[in-house]
A protein has these predicted regions:
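Rossmann-fold cofactor-recognition segment
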Residues: 73-93, 175-186, 190-193, 197-198, ...
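C-terminal helical subdomain
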Residues: 156-157, 162-207, 338-385
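Hydrophobic positions on the long internal alpha-helix
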Residues: 113, 243, 254-258, 304-305
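Active-site helix of classical SDR
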Residues: 255, 293, 297
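Active-site-adjacent segment of SDR/Rossmann-fold oxidoreductases
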Residues: 106, 307-317
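Conserved glycine-rich Rossmann-like NAD(P)H-binding loop of the short-chain dehydrogenase/reductase
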Residues: 51-69, 80-86, 111-116, 121-150
Length: 385
């Protein structure tokens, strides 16, 4: 048995363990990463920064993300190459505005990693504990946190104008009229508190106990049932649409609108990574009857890759879908804990493994000179769609 993995064969274990720490020289390259605040996305962000890349992270909770990155022991080595923007991918006009901002202020973009996804929908109470931080006056923020969100705060007209670190271009503020129309960009965190369904009014401390966080330092969610267990007739229209927007529509917009910026970046090393899952795979022998809406969204994302990879490859952009592997248990806490107690269950991989997989097309391509494209990648190799 491998010293780290207890559910992988020896050769797979050796490969996965090597990939966990593999880096490449990405000096001077710029990467956009969505969903880079926690779990796989956060670990992917750290890996890219340690490769030397300049990283733009998009997340609903920019200040919380900044605190997490700033707490890393080697923050001083790469903190000046990280920018964090607040963005709610459920609001597509805001995604369009964010793309416009990047097109106006950036001179290159080497990779897009569409990592953000909505698998289990959480009510506002799940995020409430972060709101004081996300709405606090700027002068209350630590200097290292303000450093990371400075461009974002300028964009949404909260902070004084300040130059971007890349080339001295002064970050523009959004016109007041436009700022009102793109709350997913200017008030990304606050939108999480908008109640759209009856269950969104659940604020009981018994469900979201104050001060209790899970292993990913997220609010503990003690609801007895969540999205992962829903069947077709149980999924609300709101959840269906949100899942499609975050998992498929927003990546579509980012890939489409930012293509000119990637085309203006010289080289054939460029990548678009659409983070997918086997739930979106048609050639899979067994399917459960649960979470059809998330399956649909990942299938749609895969079809974007399948359709557009050739077109993007003609511009030196290598587009792939990548499965993260089984790294987490999405079941409600009570069910997950029962499986641990009764079956000693745990996923075969962890979030570092998942992060290594989604950035591997970039890192492996740079290290080997062979950039794969047009593939659905699982376990570091091509698999069926």
């Amino acid at each position: 048995m491998h010293h780290f993995y207890d559910q992988l064969c020896p050769s797979c274990a050796a490969l996965n363990y090597t990939k966990r720490s593999e880096l490449a020289d990405m000096s001077g390259m710029v990467v956009l990463l969505t969903g880079g605040r926690v779990k796989i996305g956060y670990q992917a962000g750290i890996k890219l920064l340690r490769c030397g890349a300049k990283l733009i992270v998009a997340t609903r909770f920019a200040r919380d993300a900044a605190e997490r990155y700033a707490a890393e022991p080697d923050f001083a080595d790469w903190g000046d190459r990280l920018e964090i923007f607040g963005l709610d991918l459920r609001h597509i006009p805001s995604v369009e505005a964010f793309c416009t901002h990047l097109l106006k202020t950036r001179t290159r973009l080497d990779a897009i990693v569409n990592n953000a996804c909505q698998t289990v929908r959480r009510p506002p109470g799940f995020y409430e504990h972060m709101m004081n931080r996300e709405t606090a006056a700027l002068e209350l923020l630590p200097a290292n946190v303000l450093q990371l969100v400075g461009s974002y705060e300028t964009l949404r007209s909260v902070a004084p104008s300040r130059p971007l670190g890349e080339d001295g271009i002064v970050a523009p503020k959004l016109p007041a009229a436009e700022a009102i129309n793109v709350p997913g960009l200017t008030r990304a965190a606050e939108l999480s508190q908008t109640a759209l369904l009856p269950e969104d009014h659940l604020t009981a401390a018994s469900l979201f106990p104050a001060g209790q966080l899970d292993q990913d330092l997220q609010q503990l969610d003690l609801r007895g049932r969540n999205s992962w267990r829903l069947r077709l007739h149980e999924v609300s229209a709101v959840e269906l649409l949100e899942t499609q927007l975050v998992n498929a529509v927003a990546p579509f917009v980012l890939n489409a609108r930012l293509k000119p910026l990637m085309e203006a970046t010289p080289g054939v090393h460029k990548h678009v990574v659409n983070v997918s899952a086997v739930e979106g795979q048609f050639y899979r022998l067994r399917k459960t009857t649960k979470h059809p809406h998330t399956n649909m969204a990942k299938a749609a994302l895969n079809m974007m890759t399948r359709t557009s990879a050739t077109d993007y490859h003609d511009s030196g952009i290598n587009m792939n879908s990548v499965d993260t592997g089984w790294v987490s248990d999405e079941d409600p806490v009570a069910i997950a804990e029962a499986k641990i107690a009764e079956q000693r269950f745990h996923p075969p991989l962890d979030i570092v493994d998942g992060a290594a997989r989604i950035v591997d097309p970039i890192i492996d391509g740079l290290n080997t000179g062979t950039h794969v494209w047009g593939q659905f990648l699982k376990d570091y190799t091509s698999t069926d769609w």
